[in-house]
Each structure stands twice: as structure tokens, then as C-alpha cells.
Amino acid sequence: MEENGKTKEEILLFLKKAKSADASYERVLSSMCTYPHEIAVLAHTQFIESNMGDPGLFPGTFNLEKQVLAMFGKMLHHKNSPEKAGYLTTGGTESNIQAIRSMHNFRHDISRPNIVMPESAHFSFDKVANLSGIEIRKASLDKLLKVDLDSVRSLIDKNTIGLVGIAGTTEFGQLDPINELSKIAIEKGIFLHIDAAFGGFVIPFMDIDYTYDFRLEGVTSMTIDPHKMALSTIPSGGLLFKEPEYFECLEIHTPYLSVNKQYSLTGTRSGAGVASTYAVMKHLGRKGYKKVVSDCMSVTKKLVDGAEKLGINTVIDPVLNIVALDVPEADLVRKKLLDEYGWHVSITRNPRALRIVIMPHIKNETIELFLKDLAKVIK
């Protein structure tokens, strides 16, 4: 830091140059984030200074959070005061960490606990293991890349405190058999956390026969991310427990704040994300989100149909707006797409394929351009 400060104009010019080096979402096909909705940005700016880590100072923002949790609860069929059973987090990673922390605290009688989850689970659970020392056991996947239930059962023992199921896997967008995982959790008397960070704002607005939420008796907690398909600003995540007592397992005494209890992982917590999520959910409503999801699925179909004309199949039939294209030498294709045409795509691990996420910023015209460039790369 220099002795003398810069002018406002100098700073803004520097920031403009820095921003110009960032990728533009128009050619980003790999991210689960997107441009936030205009009303979300306005709300975020209006509440920029609010700190949910000290809610006694910001009762208006705290009330907005309760209303958001109530909307989450209705969407996820929660039955027991959702506004008292969760909070808005920084995103899926924090939500997953806190869900497992709650399991651990609730079952403090087990000295060497383990948790069973799919191989497809998000890397945030590896952070859980690193932070807590809890053993993470990963069940294999079936041919459709859903978690294999026999594998899950084989990994459960007397020290297993919980299971994890994924409603919209990060790599393939696949849906685990949550109904069957719920039955196993009930049978074994253990927790079941559902990571619906991506699918949580997609599945409720699709016409599919799939139950993954609090309608299932065995589901004890859920992750849902508004800053993905809900078009909220970053950071905006959500964590909801079936019962307030599971949420209360996260309680920490805070003697020098305006309230004497805190449940979040972070101390300081953005109220701007709360306001942003409230604003966009209220503005779009169910009909608005149905259109967002319908549009994304329509573009997804256009991508799949266009790829087939190039002789490229998908690894699995897309369930959500995530597509894995089975191309030879996927890593090389990815590199050429970026270096020669500026497209940002990612690679799935097993099998290795081109991973494309059709977020709301991706339009039909975008896919047409991408397919033309993909055809040049693979010829």
C-alpha cells in the first residue's frame, strides 16, 4: 500500500482493466454460476453493509432470512418451522461442512465416526474429512452413474453416523436414488444429508417423478444454492435441517455480540446475499423459475441434438441441464476449444468427457457457435 492514495478515477480505471482479464460468461460453458438477476444485484447493493453474524443489529435483514428459509421450506416440503432450522450460507461447501458437523456433534458418543457417500460427491466433503477427522467412505456408482445401493450397504458399520445423497451431481447432473437411501438411513438409524446445491433450484420446476426432499422420512438435512440456478448473487447458499434440534447442534456461545448464540461456520456473514435471494425469489416466483429451467432444458436438448449430428454421444442421457459429451481425447479437445476459440468447458473424471453446464446465460445462438467450433476441433 502506497503512502498516498489514488484518485477515484485511477482506481476505477485499474478495476476496469482487471475486470477485462476475467472470462466473459458468454463463452463459459463449465460454470454452475451465472449472471445474477438485475433485481438480485439491486438488493445486494442496498444491503451491502449488513452483517448477519450480528443479527441483533440488523433485524430487518434477519427477518428477510427467515422469509427465505420459509420459501425454501415450502419448495422442499419441510414440515417443522424451517425458519428455525437453517440459515443462508456462503454456498454448497459451507452447507455440506455444517451438515456433517451437525451429524458429528449429535453423535458425539461415537469416537471414530464415518460417513458413506457416492464417489460422485462434491469435493467439499473431502474438506470435511480434512477438518474433522471423520472418515469418508465412498460408494461406487452404477452404469448410469448413480450411487450403487449395494456398495452403500457394504460400507456401513457401527461407526457410521450418516449417508450423503446427491440430487444433481456436479459432473453429470445425475440424481441418486434418494428414496432408497432414505430407507437405508431409517433402517440403520443414521442421518441422511442431501446435496442439492445444483438440483435444488432445478428439480422442483421440472415435470419429473423424483422425490428427494423432506417428504422422505429419512432425509435430515439439505443443501441448496441460490447463487446457481436461482440467479442470486455470490455468495448465497442455503442449509436446512429436518428438525431444529439438528440445527441447534451447531450452536456456539457469542457473549460479546448483540445475540448470545451463533450457528454459522463463518462469523461475519453477508446480509447482501440474504436480500438478493429474497428479492429474486419473490420477483420470479414459481412461474418465473419454471421458465428459467424450461429454457435451460430446451438449450440442453439443442446441444445434445447438435452433438449427435457430429457423431458425438452423451455419456448418459442428460437428466438436468448438465451434459457430458463422449469425445475421444477429451483433454486435448478441451484445450483446443479454449486456445483456438475461447470456449471454457471442463472435463469429467470417470469417464473422461467434455462437461457442459447450460446455465441461463447460455442461449441457442451460443450453442450454435459452440457446435461449429467443436466440429472444427474434432474433424
Curated annotation (Swiss-Prot):
Q: Keyword annotations for this protein?
A: Decarboxylase, Lyase, Pyridoxal phosphate
Repressor listed as a keyword: no
Q: Which GO terms describe its biological process?
A: carboxylic acid metabolic process; coenzyme A biosynthetic process; methanofuran biosynthetic process
Class in the EC hierarchy, top level: lyase
* A GO term for molecular function: pyridoxal phosphate binding
Question: Which superkingdom is the protein from?
Answer: Archaea
Q: What is its EC number?
A: 4.1.1.11, 4.1.1.25
One matching Pfam family is: Pyridoxal_deC
Q: According to its UniProt record, which cofactors does this protein need? A: pyridoxal 5'-phosphate
N6-(pyridoxal phosphate)lysine: residues bearing it: 228
The biological pathway it contributes to is: Cofactor biosynthesis; methanofuran biosynthesis; Cofactor biosynthesis; coenzyme A biosynthesis
The reaction(s) catalysed by this protein are: L-tyrosine + H(+) = tyramine + CO2; L-aspartate + H(+) = beta-alanine + CO2
| InterPro entries the UniProt entry points to | GrpII_AminoAcid_Decarb, MfnA, PyrdxlP-dep_de-COase, PyrdxlP-dep_Trfase, PyrdxlP-dep_Trfase_major, PyrdxlP-dep_Trfase_small
Keyword Lyase found: yes
Q: Which family does it belong to?
A: Belongs to the group II decarboxylase family. MfnA subfamily.
- Protein role: Catalyzes the decarboxylation of L-tyrosine to produce tyramine for methanofuran biosynthesis. Can also catalyze the decarboxylation of L-aspartate to produce beta-alanine for coenzyme A (CoA) biosynthesis.
Protein name (Swiss-Prot/TrEMBL)? Probable L-tyrosine/L-aspartate decarboxylase
Source organism (scientific name): Methanococcoides burtonii (strain DSM 6242 / NBRC 107633 / OCM 468 / ACE-M)
